[in-house]
Each structure stands twice: as C-alpha cells, then as structure tokens.
UniProtKB/Swiss-Prot annotation:
Residues 430-440 have a biased composition (Polar residues). This is Nuclear rim protein 1. Residues 416-458 are annotated as: Disordered. The chain crosses the membrane at residues 145-165, 252-272. It is found in: Nucleus membrane. Keywords: Membrane, Nucleus, Phosphoprotein, Transmembrane, Transmembrane helix. The modification Phosphoserine is found at residues 3, 417, 474. The gene is NUR1. The keyword Protein biosynthesis does not apply. Its main location: nucleus. It comes from the Eukaryota. Pfam families: DUF2418 (PF10332). Member of a perinuclear network that controls recombination at multiple loci to maintain genome stability. Required for rDNA repeat stability.
Length: 484
C-alpha cells in the first residue's frame, strides 16, 4: 500500500467525521429552536392543516367520526349507570375504616386481640381486597377521564361551529338598510384608519378588550343622512366538514346522555335524534342554501347575457367606430325591466343622484340599428315639422336657436339655388357652382349676402362680425362644431 492510499483513507475518514458532526449540530440546532421558539412549530402545523381541503372529507371522515364519538359516549354512560353505580358504596369505602389491628386498646388485651385477628381472617369481602372491585375502581376512573375528554371535545366543536366561522364583507353599493344584527353602518374614513396603531396608544384594558373581543366594539355614531358611508356585513359561513361533525356529534345528544339514566331503550331515542338532525340540517337546510346559490347564478347569467354581452358584441363595437360623417352622439345606457303587470320599464342611471330614473315612454332615446344609421348618413333624414338636415352635422349650442328658427327659410333657399346664382351672390370658397355637392348643407347653399342680412336683424348681431364671417366662410365648420 503506497503513501497516496494512506492519504486518501485519512481524507475519507475526515469527511465521515465531519458529516457526523454536522448532523449532530443540525439536530442540536433543531431541538434548540423547538425549545426556544415553540410558536414556530405551531405555525408550521397550522399551515399544514389549513392546506388540507377538509370539505372533501365531510362525508367520509366527519360524519363517521361524529357518530363514533356519540356511540362511545353512550356506551360509557350505559356502563356507569348499570355497572359502576350499583357498586358505588363498595368502590368508595375506605380500606382502613374497620382495621382492628391498628387499635392500641385492643393490643392491651390479649383476648380481644385474638378475637379481632380471627374475625379479619375469616371475612375477606372488603372491596380493597377483591380483584373484582379493584377492576371496577380502575374502570370508574377511566370512564370519568374519558367523559371529561368527550365533553371538552364536544364543547370545542360546538363553539367552533357557532362562533368560529365568520366573514366580513364591505358593501359600498348597498342603499337600503336591512333589519339584520350582522349589518352595521360605517364611515368611509374608517377604511383609512390604522387600527393597531390607535389601539396601542390606548390603555391596557382597551388592548385586552380588543384582542379578546376582536373588532366588534361599538364604533362612533354615524349620521343617517351622511353620504360617505358603507355597510359592513358579518356573515356566518361554517364549512361543510364542521357542519357534518356538529350534526353527528351533537351537543343536544351529549347533554341528554349526561343528565339522564341511560339504558338500552335510550339507544332508540339517540338514533331517532341523530336521523332527524341530519335530515333537517344537511338534507334540507344546506340543500336550500345550495338552491339559492343556483338561482342567484342563473339570475346573474341572465343579466350578463341580456345587458352586458348585448352591449359589447361585435356589432356594437362596429357601430362606435368613427366614419367620414362623424360618430353619432352617445345616449345614456338604458336598462329595460318589466313590472308585475308585464309592462316594459326603461330606466337610466343618474350619476348625480346615484339612483335609477324611469324614462317617459315618449321621450326615450333608443339608438337605432346599424342599417338605419348607415342610410341616414348617406342622405337627409326627415324630422318632424317637415324639416330636414344632414345627419352627423351638429351646430354650436349658441347658434342652434338661430338655425332652428331659420331652417324653413333655408329649405326655401335650397329649392331656389339657381335663382341665387343668377343674382350674383357670393358663395363660399371651394364650392362647385355648376354641380351642387351632396355633402353641402342647405345653409352653405344660401348666398353669403343673404345670410349676413339675416344676421343683422337677428338676436346674434351682438357677435363680432369677424367671428361671424369666419364661421360662415370656414370650410371646416362641420369639423370645428362637431359635437363629440
């Protein structure tokens, strides 16, 4: 064996020793962390428990476990009332109550000592000397301990079921205050509060009160007419696993067995009680909650199909695209509902009042179909009073009364455009005088001099003449005064 082999063996032994030392030090560190910070272990265990889907084991684990605990409690109470209770006196008698061998007076007299010794040797019926009563005494202690564990477990399950599953919802769009003890009104400023910093500044009693009672302390009074408010709903939502465990390991059955003389006929009442409770809660009430969820989902899907999807489909997106004649003016979103009599009701949401307002039947502005709008863009749409104007052309709000009053004169001027050409009136620039254009409005076909005369006698003569001329001469008037 060479020197290199010896060096390699020594090197290998050092690695093994180092690994053993590292493993020992790692175990020492783990034990030290476990002893110094046991809350870390509790945190790890809670994380593992929370990651388990307990609702999947509601039927396979919770219900059989609860029934087993109830049957175990029934058997223990049955043995206590029929086996331990008749021998209660013999089990609780003191072993040294009639021990004559411990009497100093009897030891002074020899004949009395002989009588007492012969009496004790002939009577071996004391409970402490019999193996039967020793076994019963052991069973009595075991039954008491088991009853205490089962009562504590049932109390924990009941409290966890009734007070341990609450979720808080902030309702910002609820307007009507319902008569529910779980619904409270709060101010919007409460959302920006730093609760724990405010609590730490208070007294020790306030801190203990908060951590034991949670955030259920009564807050400041909120004005009923205040606008910046929201409702907070604290809803009780137990899990399916806990519901089945509570029903199968019911506190009513445990209380009944604890305060009554249990016999074999009591099993009939327990079986009937378990069946009725399971039928009412799991097969009726819980399924009713699931049916309400189905109805809510169906109503939400119907609203989405009729109101939401109808407004974001492909045709609606095409209608909102800009065209050469400009986009149409937007109308407020109209929601269609029906009354109890079957009448159609159209409502629009008022953002200032924050409520829906019903639209009159004669003044509803429902946008037309796409084909109708395309036809209107190509020509002149007819309006009431036998007036016409090009669709897509929007006047200025200040000038609209004047054009509305003079629209009849413009129609007459449109019919006699050839006569205006013979009069030698000035026309707008970029206008083909030989062939009238389709896109020209009736006002642009009227001579400039005639329009200026109408302005001088109207209520708009206070305007600057340069502004009026620029408005009338501008070829991009439609673009500048297009209502967006």
């Amino acid at each position: 064996m060479g020197s290199n082999d010896l060096i390699n063996e020594a090197y290998d032994d050092s690695e093994v020793v180092g690994e053993e030392r590292e493993s020992k030090s790692a175990w020492m560190k783990r034990w030290y962390q476990l002893l110094t910070s046991p809350l870390d272990l509790q945190l790890v265990i809670n994380e593992k428990l929370e990651m388990i889907n307990w609702d999947a084991y509601a039927k396979s684990l919770a219900k059989p476990l609860g029934n087993f605990l109830t049957i175990l409690f029934f058997i223990i109470r049955l043995l206590q009332d029929n086996l331990i209770k008749p021998n209660y006196y013999k089990l609780n008698v003191k072993s040294g109550a009639f021990d004559l061998s411990k009497s100093n007076k009897l030891k002074e007299f020899d004949y009395l000592w002989e009588i007492s010794s012969s009496f004790q040797n002939s009577n071996q019926f004391y409970a402490f000397q019999s193996w039967y009563f020793v076994t019963l005494r052991f069973l009595n202690n075991l039954f008491r301990f088991t009853i205490f564990i089962l009562l504590s477990l049932n109390l924990y399950v009941s409290c966890k079921f009734m007070f341990g599953y609450f979720k808080t919802y902030n309702l910002f769009h609820l307007k009507k205050e319902f008569n529910s003890p779980n619904l409270t009104k709060h101010n919007l400023k409460d959302l920006s509060k730093e609760y724990y910093e405010d609590i730490y500044k208070q007294s020790l009693w306030s801190m203990l009160k908060h951590f034991f009672r949670g955030s259920r302390d009564d807050g400041p009074h909120v004005n009923q007419n205040e606008v910046e408010i929201f409702f907070q709903l604290r809803k009780w939502i137990p899990t399916n696993f806990m519901i089945n465990l509570f029903v199968s390991f019911s506190p009513t059955a445990i209380v009944f067995l604890s305060f009554s003389d249990v016999s074999f006929t009591s099993a009939i009442a327990i079986v009937f009680h378990q069946y009725i409770l399971d039928y009412i809660i799991t097969k009726r009430f819980q399924r009713s909650v699931d049916d309400d969820l189905i109805l809510s989902s169906a109503a939400l899907q119907e609203y989405e199909d009729k109101h939401i999807m109808a407004r974001i489909n492909q045709c609606s997106n095409i209608d909102t695209l800009s065209s050469a004649m400009g986009t149409r003016s937007k109308t407020p979103r109209i929601f269609t509902t029906h009354s109890l009599c079957g009448e159609e009701i159209r409502e629009v949401y008022n953002y200032e009042k924050r409520e829906f307002e019903a639209l009159p039947k004669m003044t509803e502005s429902v946008p037309g179909s796409r084909e109708t709008r395309i036809k209107d863009y190509g020509g002149i749409s007819q309006v009431s009073d036998n007036q016409s104007h090009p669709i897509g052309f929007h006047y200025s709000p200040r000038m609209s009364p004047y054009y509305r009053d003079k629209v009849l004169d413009n129609n007459l001027a449109q019919s006699s455009s050839n006569e205006n050409l013979e009069k030698g009136g000035a026309f707008l620039p970029n206008q083909d005088q030989n062939r009238p254009s389709k896109s020209l409005s009736p006002l642009r076909k009227t001579p400039l001099s005639a329009r200026q005369k109408r302005f001088e006698g109207s209520e708009f003569n206070v305007l600057n003449k340069n502004d009026i001329n620029s408005i009338l001469r501008s070829p991009k008037k439609k673009k500048n005064y297009h209502k967006r």
